[in-house]
A protein has these predicted regions:
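Mobile active-site "lid"/loop adjacent to the S-adenosyl-L-methionine
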Residues: 188-218
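Conserved beta-strand segments of alpha/beta enzyme cores
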Residues: 83, 137, 162-164, 258-261
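Conserved SAM/SAH cofactor-binding pocket of Class I
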Residues: 95-198
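Residue-level signal for inorganic ion chemistry
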Residues: 29, 67, 97, 125, ...
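Active-site beta-alpha loop architecture of Rossmann-like, nucleotide-cofactor-dependent enzymes
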Residues: 71, 189-192, 243
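Conserved Class I SAM-dependent methyltransferase catalytic core
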Residues: 213-276
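Non-catalytic accessory regions of SAM-dependent methyltransferases
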Residues: 1-40, 49
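Conserved AdoMet
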Residues: 28-106
Length: 279
């Protein structure tokens, strides 16, 4: 069986299983097994698929049919043009979160500063920001030790030196230092949300997704605590659910933040809300 036929059959299986991107999933999985990119697959589609690699590929397709995320199956995900290692201990970086990086860069025009990423996971946000602002000191924290180890390894593999990653339950392990910009993509899904039973999120850590009855528990905690760690004039920017923007703005305003505003993601949904402390 040649590569084109193998991909076509796999894509059909994935489509029947409910994948929203069956051909892409198949190409990414086969490219991973063969150690090639998707362009190579298009160019050499008439080549015979090696038996051993074919067996490995079909095992991955079977796992994907069961719903396992592609990023976990191949152990990597691209974010902001950076290739990041992933694991089941962390949330899978998503394209919409690049909106938070874009906002952070707009809020950080200076050559130097101090940046904090709360709940860093793979280190995606911290590393994307650090790659664009090499003069900034970038800190990422996560309460999961495996996540901190993974983020550290990603920084090393990408040769991004202006970062450090610490184990901390939100701010608990930080000293009296202050930051010019604090960002977070915290858990913001309500416990009863039916989407938790669908798609990739079924396999992602619940601790990175769920935040109480209304999904706002961690956002409230961050808003209340961040002021003590922001330098004068510093910003707090947070990702949240598309239907939470108004409530997050209210929480920021009630806590005393200024210049509160929400920004939209790639789909046109309000996804990031920010506020500033007094100078």
């Amino acid at each position: 069986m040649n590569i084109d036929s193998l991909l076509g059959r796999a894509a059909a299986r994935l489509s029947e299983a409910g994948s929203t991107s069956p051909r892409l999933d198949a190409e990414v999985l086969l490219g991973h097994v063969l150690g090639v990119d998707r362009t190579w697959l298009y160019t050499w589609g008439d080549r015979a698929a090696p038996v051993y690699e074919r067996a490995r590929f079909e095992a991955l397709v079977a796992a994907r049919v069961e719903g396992h995320p592609v990023a976990y199956l191949i152990g990597e995900r691209e974010f902001w043009g950076l290739s990041l290692s992933t694991s089941s201990h962390t949330l899978i970086p998503r394209p919409d979160t690049e909106t938070l990086v874009e906002i952070a860069l707009e809020l950080a025009p200076d050559a130097e500063g101090r940046f904090l990423d709360l709940g860093t996971g793979t280190g995606a946000i911290a590393l994307a920001f650090a790659s664009e602002r090499p003069g900034w000191q970038v800190t990422g924290i996560d309460r999961v030790e495996e996540a901190v180890a993974l983020a550290t390894a990603n920084a090393e593999s990408l040769n991004i030196a202006n970062t450090r990653f610490l184990v901390s339950d939100w701010f608990s392990s930080l000293t009296a230092e202050c930051f010019d910009l604090i960002v977070a993509n915290p858990p913001y899904i309500a416990e009863s949300d039916p989407h938790l039973m669908l798609g990739d999120v079924r396999f992602e850590p619940a601790s990175a997704l769920v935040a109480g009855e209304d999904g706002l528990a961690d956002l409230r905690r961050l808003i209340d605590s961040a002021m003590r760690y922001l330098c004068p004039g510093g910003w707090l920017a947070m990702e949240h659910g598309h239907d939470q923007a108004e409530r997050v703005r209210q929480l920021l305003q009630a806590a005393g933040y200024h210049e509160v505003a929400s920004h939209h993601d790639l789909s046109g949904e309000p996804r990031v809300t920010l506020g500033r402390v007094g100078g």
